[in-house]
Amino acid sequence: MHRNNERINLEKSNDWANTNEPSIACFLNSLARESQSVQLLWGEDGKRVYRLPLANSDSINIPLSYFSSLGSHEYCLPALLHTQDSIKTLSVEQLIEHIVNEPALVGIVSEAKKAIFTKRVLESHRNTEQAIEHSPYQEQLFTEQLDFKTAEQGLLIGHSFHPAPKSREQFSLSDAKLYSPELGGQFKLFWLSVEQSLLTSGSSADIHFNQRFEALVAHDPKLVEALQNAQQQGHELLPVHPWQWHVMVENPSIKGYIATKQIQNLGQLGATWYPTSSTRSLYAPGLPYMLKFSLSVKLTNSIRNLSLKECDSWNDLNDLFQHPQLAQQLGNGRGFQLMQEPAYIGLKDLNGKIIDESLVAFRDNPLMNNPAEEAVVLATLTQQNPYGGSSLVAARIEHYATQQHLSLHQAASLWFDAYCRHAVVPLFHLQANFGIVFLAHQQNIVMQLEQGFPVGMYYRDCQGTGYTDLAFKLFGEQLGDRKEALENYWNQDKVRRYFAYYLIINSTFNLISAICANLDVEESELIEILYHNLNALLQSGVKDDLCLRYVLTSEALCCKGNFFCYLQNFNENSIPDPAVIYFDLPNPLARVEEIAHV
């Protein structure tokens, strides 16, 4: 039997070991997912082929080294241009040029948008190639146990279904070397002494902001002294990302504050900080908090500035989880855990309004006392290996199989089932029984591993948190009664669209493909395990079963169209109706139920 998600012609695959460029795979896979014109065919030699039909009966053909029923294909580059009288290889630049100029593939696009898109895609490709070449960790990222810092800085590829997963327009190469995680960036923060009246801060869970701030600076005697000196002058300290400082000093209000010495830059002090996979969030081993900054860089689909409304909502979330009923849902050192964002601080302008570019949010660091713990962001576990070889998740499953004397097939099934129990089911449980929705994409899920096997997870980045009618029914006193006026009130349509996309398609389907591309297990087998875990939760009796039933039975799931969102130059965070960038993707979970009833 020829497997549906087979590693094609394994005995010949060594010749192709370095011909799959993961950044191009991300580009091609996002196009195939969104364009009905892309064809996935059987070639005459029995290999799968990715075919792009062009005008005049020409086509671009790319053999696959791995065909995924879920769309995470791997390729044998270079692409081949087939014309009536010749076959020639295409460079990456030529491949992209052919695609953006073919209306049958991408529709009618203005020349200006084509130029912007092409520039960003090629920039992302170059960034990825630089990361692969200059990462301080290299093949270690795909073979060894990783701590949190290394895993965060080991995300070389980025979003697996995006045409430009490593686009960051405002960074120069020298900026990237300092501030990008994949190049091993590390730096000290600028610390400002700021007149107290110019600052706004917030804190939650009945802990005063000053208490949190003192804990943050306690590691460095110079910072402690600087804080004491500032307070004696009626000032407080404000940490600032060094790159963002160059943006902030152009703000008219901040220029004025500097001139009047209401703001004084004390220089770079304290701990060394490491950018995590999001670039704007920073980690310093051994400190009680990570820091999430506004960073005025367009990363993939959006500019990454914080807002006061967001920061307040994260404080509210932390307060909400002080409720005994919710606190009981969280693991204590294992199981499902939250990296809350319990505090923030930022500058006000001359009119008393928050300067978004100055905001910084505190994020709990559960690894403070154990920075060597194997805590690996899901995106690093699942990314395609640019050095040739298997994904990290496959390597960790192989390690677990060896330790436990299991077959790879058994180990893969057990590993994925544990992922479902520690990540998928708890997130659905919170949605279905408490009305709390977390947008759990691959960079928000940090798997807690022991000897490579899941024993828990940390959910991080509370930006995509929503509350349904059920949450307002259960926690109305905490959430208030003006739900329709709240941006984070989610009706059922919104829950189905976003929650299912991020957790099931973005995270879990990609994990399935990353496991099955390298181990002796079918994608359909892991889809069945996912189905049975979700169905067990449904059968246990939940308060709101609509989203669970949608995921288990709907013929299609709502999927975000990153390729065309990016091609049309949308800022995802400012589209009036983000639903316009979503489309229907066939749902393999519904097929499990169909087969069960045959």
From Swiss-Prot:
Keywords: ATP-binding, Ligase, Nucleotide-binding, Transferase
Pathway connected to this protein: Siderophore biosynthesis; aerobactin biosynthesis
Entry superkingdom: Bacteria
Role according to the record: Catalyzes the attachment of a first N-acetyl-N-hydroxylysine to a carboxylic group of citric acid to yield N-citryl-N-acetyl-N-hydroxylysine. Involved in the biosynthesis of the siderophore aerobactin which is a chelator that mediates the high-affinity iron transport systems induced under iron-stressed conditions.
Catalytic activity: N(6)-acetyl-N(6)-hydroxy-L-lysine + citrate + ATP = N(2)-citryl-N(6)-acetyl-N(6)-hydroxy-L-lysine + AMP + diphosphate + H(+)
Enzyme class: ligase
Organism, as annotated: Vibrio mimicus
Protein name (database record): N(2)-citryl-N(6)-acetyl-N(6)-hydroxylysine synthase
GO molecular function: acid-amino acid ligase activity; ATP binding; transferase activity
EC number: 6.3.2.38
Ion transport recorded as keyword: no
Family listed: Belongs to the IucA/IucC family.
Gene Ontology biological process terms from the UniProt entry: aerobactin biosynthetic process; siderophore biosynthetic process
Gene: iucA
